C-alpha cells in the first residue's frame, strides 16, 4: 500500500503579488523552495489563512533572496497581496517508508522572514 505524505511546507508566507494575467503557477523565492524541498514545476496545494480558500497549482522559481510569493493566473482570484498562505507538496511512498518519514517545514513571520526550518510538524497540545 502507498501513502501520500507531506513532503515540504512553507508555513505562513505572505503573498507579495497576485497577477491574474501571468500564465498560472505560484512563483516562490528559490531560497524558500530549497528550504522546503519543493521543486520547480512541482504540484502544490495552497491554503489561504485569510479567506479559507484551498487551491492547487504548481511552483515556479522566483529570484533567490527576493522573498517573492506571487500567485498567478486563475489562482490570483484566490489570494490577495498580504494574505498569509500555507504551501504544501506531497509525496507517495510505501507504508514502511511513511512510518519513518519526516517532512521539511519552513516557518515564516513578518514580511517573509524565514525564522526556522524543521524536519517535523510539532505535536498539537491542549
Swiss-Prot record:
InterPro entries listed in its UniProt record: Asp_de-COase-like_dom_sf, Asp_decarbox
Record EC number: 4.1.1.11
Active site positions, chain numbering: 25 (schiff-base intermediate with substrate), 58 (proton donor)
Residue positions, PTM Pyruvic acid (Ser): 25
GO biological process: alanine biosynthetic process; pantothenate biosynthetic process
Cofactor binding, per record: Binds 1 pyruvoyl group covalently per subunit.
Pathway assigned to this chain's UniProt record: Cofactor biosynthesis; (R)-pantothenate biosynthesis; beta-alanine from L-aspartate: step 1/1
GO MF entry, a single one: aspartate 1-decarboxylase activity
Keywords tagged on the record: Autocatalytic cleavage, Cytoplasm, Decarboxylase, Lyase, Pantothenate biosynthesis, Pyruvate, Schiff base, Zymogen
Pfam families attached to this UniProt entry: Asp_decarbox
Subcellular location per the Swiss-Prot or TrEMBL entry: Cytoplasm
Gene Ontology CC: one annotated term: cytosol
Needed co-factor(s): pyruvate
Catalytic activity: L-aspartate + H(+) = beta-alanine + CO2
Post-translational modification remark: Is synthesized initially as an inactive proenzyme, which is activated by self-cleavage at a specific serine bond to produce a beta-subunit with a hydroxyl group at its C-terminus and an alpha-subunit with a pyruvoyl group at its N-terminus.
Top EC category: lyase
Superkingdom, natural source: Bacteria
Positions contributing to substrate binding: 57, 73-75
Stated family: Belongs to the PanD family.
Subunit organization: Heterooctamer of four alpha and four beta subunits.
Function: Catalyzes the pyruvoyl-dependent decarboxylation of aspartate to produce beta-alanine.
PANTHER family, per the entry: ASPARTATE 1-DECARBOXYLASE (PTHR21012:SF0)
Name of protein: Aspartate 1-decarboxylase
Species of provenance: Erwinia tasmaniensis (strain DSM 17950 / CFBP 7177 / CIP 109463 / NCPPB 4357 / Et1/99)
Gene: panD
